[in-house]
Amino acid sequence: MAYKHLLAAFDVGGSKTDSVLFNERGEILARVKGEGGNPLERGIDNAAAHYAAILNKLFLEGTGDETAPIDVLYGAVAAKEYFGSGLEDRLSVLLPRVRRLRIEGDGCALISGMLGHRDGACMICGTGSSVYIRQGDDYCHIGGWGHLIDTCGSGYMLGRLAIRAACRAYDGRGEQTVLCDLLEKQCGEPIWEHFIELYRGERPYIATFAHTVFEARAMGDPVATAIFDEGARDLAEIAHAAARRLGKPFDLVLNGGIFTAFPEYARAVGALCPPRINIVYSDVPPIYGGAVEAMYEIGQICEGDFRATFLEGLG
């Protein structure tokens, strides 16, 4: 064996699960993706079984062995903080080959991907949204109360507001908008005739329509522009709350699928944040931050060579 350690990381969001097996040089041995697995939506037992199925496939693909030990497994899981040690307890039974396991909320990996394992904060904007703050071994979130309560500015919220605006235009209750045409282009029929599929697909499917807001805004559509502006303001409001809580300057990493796909949205949010916040626009995927945390578990800091090798391996 040309390496000393086998490490793994997985990242779970509302729409997808990403996992990698790698060594201490950053060489990726296997990568497996699956559908999202938020434990608030799936239930903790179903979620743990879902992660275990993906990870067992990852381990087998990367080692060719059903029992080869994995030195470290780090997980970044949306909504993990609501379940205490429940996920660790279940996965330690389902994945007996793992020697060391640590699972945190999905924000910590985003901080570490850009800042390393140190204090800071991140704003996630993907299917959902929230701000995570890490100070030493403690972390907390602001916002991110789930799509039933509060997921402001997120992909789900943007998609939902686009669909609502189109339905209001159809009813004659709202302003006419090009969103109607863009939504129909994606789903193949008027959005108001697509409700069986919308309710069947639920939150992840509705989030796939978020792109229509950015496309319509680029076309000068005032309805889409208002949705965009509302989302940016709401996300910046979370950053202001974080600034009040910390009471000092700090780094805020912006990451997540929506920010990555539509950097103009990230810039709009950043422009509305308090000046004491140093905005860091992420240029790495969340799974890289998970790798940084896995390496931290073996006392290693991810230097430039590791980063370059790992990111090149992701493709």
Regions inferred by a protein language model and the residue ranges of each:
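Phosphate-binding/catalytic loop of phosphoryl-transfer enzymes
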Residues: 80-177, 311-315
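ATP-binding/phosphotransfer module of carbohydrate and carboxylate kinases, centering on a glycine-rich
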Residues: 1-64, 68-70, 91-93, 114-121, ...
